[in-house]
Curated annotation (Swiss-Prot):
The keyword Plastid applies. GO terms for molecular function: RNA binding. The gene is matK. The keyword Aminoacyl-tRNA synthetase does not apply. GO terms for cellular component: chloroplast. The lineage of its organism: Eukaryota, Viridiplantae, Streptophyta, Embryophyta, Tracheophyta. This is Maturase K. It comes from Hamamelis mollis (Chinese witch hazel). It holds the Pfam family MatK_N. Keywords: Chloroplast, mRNA processing, Plastid, RNA-binding, tRNA processing. Signal peptide: none annotated. InterPro entries: Domain_X (IPR024937), Maturase_MatK (IPR002866), Maturase_MatK_N (IPR024942). GO terms for biological process: mRNA processing; RNA splicing; tRNA processing. It is found in: Plastid, Chloroplast.
């Protein structure tokens, strides 16, 4: 986002922070294309992997400059000369580029919100893995947890109203509405419906950016609820219809309760409430009682109904004890267990046996859903037996090996924080043997004969960077390297959840 910020600062006097001119910049489409490749590294069909080029981008921008081609109706889109034979390609490129542009206000606002605050290495907070050290630190002291799915679909008009609070550029808002109203029948943009599924995997990037705006607004309101939880018991849900009046009413209520009801505020205060969200799933945890958790649950349900006009069933939001419940979040299965230990104490002639139980935050990889994701991607069957990939048999040997190795390292990198690495060893075995079966099928040979001819080279390709570094540092002390590799490792360069790990 530094490139975007630099562009806005250079043209601030001329463009007044307008986002609309960015749609005519070539580097926007290059960045959108790179982001698309990074997101779809595990997918078989990349949207325009081999079709997008600087020549096509220049042709697209030139046609947008020459005529007012952005005013196109759906009925004549097949005959429109601007789209021509590249209708789906152009629409995909425009929507992907516009999705990158829509993300600019959120990025700049998040950076500005961190300025002036003493947050060490705030750029690391962008990593998904930064959530898990927070969970390890906080959840050991909490009692109850609730898995919450943010309800959807949200109507398009509600998304646009939410987006107005973030994007002040009227031209960009009109362009956003144009995409969803004029091109709603194009599969490359969104599904043909007036209300979109905010967290559907088939939604386009522009729809996902708008849905992220709605989820960010919900998360901001949840943080506001957390800070003002003492006073919300008397707040009417009707005040949530307009946030300006809502803030005004809350401010008035604060003055009233501070002056008149100071003695009873502690009954409703919950200083140990924690909220974590990624995409459409959130985790709410508390050290308080089930009564307080139920109060929060109904606050959120009423908020969704009154502010986003979406229906959520309170009975489907479960409150569980952390001590006997595991929750699935971001491709990991997390739980708080007890690690028993026995201490023998000697005092004069008497000895005592003391049983201690220390809480431990355990994070493992759910192997069954992950194998299901691999089976859906045709790397194995539903039982976890590796199979060949006939769709990749036309590629060269180096391309086939490189693709399997990248997928394996990607999964190992993402799941490096697992307490138990045996599940990862099984995933590596599936991918390695699936790669061998694919190569053997291409060369019309058996797997045994192909592996014998290839030797240990294929195994070395599937080693992760961590294993390679540890083998260099401890070439002879294999037990030491294995012990270090079994430890949890969190990385600060993971900005999106792995596609195969996203089995929620």
């Amino acid at each position: 986002m530094e490139e975007f910020q630099g562009y806005l600062e250079l043209d601030k006097s001329r463009q007044h922070d307008f986002l609309y001119p960015l749609i005519f910049q070539e580097y926007i489409y290059a960045l959108a294309h790179d982001h698309g490749l990074n997101r779809s590294i595990l997918l078989e069909n990349v949207c325009y992997d081999n079709k997008s080029s600087s020549l096509i981008v220049k042709r697209l921008i030139x046609r947008m400059y020459q005529q007012n081609h952005l005013i196109i109706s759906v009925n004549d889109s097949n005959q429109n000369p601007f789209l021509g034979h590249n209708k789906n390609l152009y629409s995909q490129m425009i929507s992907e580029g516009f999705a990158v542009i829509v993300e600019i206000p959120f990025s700049l606002r998040s950076v500005s919100s961190l300025e002036g605050k003493e947050i060490x290495q705030s750029h690391n907070l962008x990593s998904i893995h930064s959530i898990f050290p927070f969970l390890e630190d906080k959840f050991l002291h909490l009692n109850y947890v609730s898995d919450i799915l943010i309800p959807h679909p949200i109507h398009l008009e509600i998304l646009v109203q939410t987006l107005r609070y973030w994007v002040k550029d009227a031209s960009s808002l009109h362009l956003f509405l144009f995409f969803f109203y004029e091109y709603y029948x194009w599969n490359s943009l969104i599904x043909p419906x007036k209300s979109i599924s905010x967290f559907s995997x088939x939604x386009x990037x522009x729809x996902x950016x708008x849905x992220x705006x709605x989820x960010x607004x919900x998360x901001x309101x949840x943080x506001f609820f957390r800070n003002q939880s003492s006073y919300l018991r008397s707040t009417s849900s009707g005040a949530l219809l307009e946030r300006i009046y809502f803030y005004g009413k809350i401010k008035h209520l604060v003055e009233v309760f501070v002056n008149d009801f100071q003695a009873i505020l502690w009954l409703f205060k919950d200083p140990f409430m924690h909220y974590v969200r990624y995409q459409g799933k959130s985790i709410l945890a508390s050290k308080g009682t089930p009564l307080l958790m139920n109060k929060w649950k109904y606050y959120l349900v009423n908020f969704w109904q009154c502010h986003f006009y979406v229906w959520s069933q309170p009975g489907r939001i479960y409150i569980n004890q952390l001590s006997n419940h595991s929750f699935d979040f971001l491709g990991y299965l997390s739980s708080v267990g007890l690690n028993p230990s026995v201490v023998r104490s000697q005092m004069l002639e008497n000895s005592f046996i003391i049983d201690n139980a220390i809480k431990k935050f355990d994070i493992i990889v759910p192997i069954i859903p992950l194998i299901g994701s691999l089976a859906k991607a045709k790397f194995c069957n539903v039982l976890g037996h590796p199979i060949s990939k006939p769709a990749r048999a036309d590629s060269s040997d180096s391309d086939i090996i490189d693709r399997f190795v990248r997928i394996c390292r990607n999964l190992s990198h993402y799941h490096s924080g697992s307490s138990k690495k045996k599940s990862l060893y099984r995933i590596k075995y599936i991918l390695r043997l699936s790669c061998a079966r694919t190569l053997a099928r291409k060369h019309k040979s058996t797997v045994r004969a192909f592996l014998k001819r290839l030797g240990s080279g294929l195994l070395e390709e599937f080693l992760t960077e961590e294993e390679q570094v540890l083998s260099l540092i401890f070439p002879k002390a294999s037990s030491t390297s294995r012990r270090l590799y079994r430890g949890r490792i969190w990385y600060f360069d993971i900005i999106s959840i792995n596609d195969l790990a996203n089995h929620e």
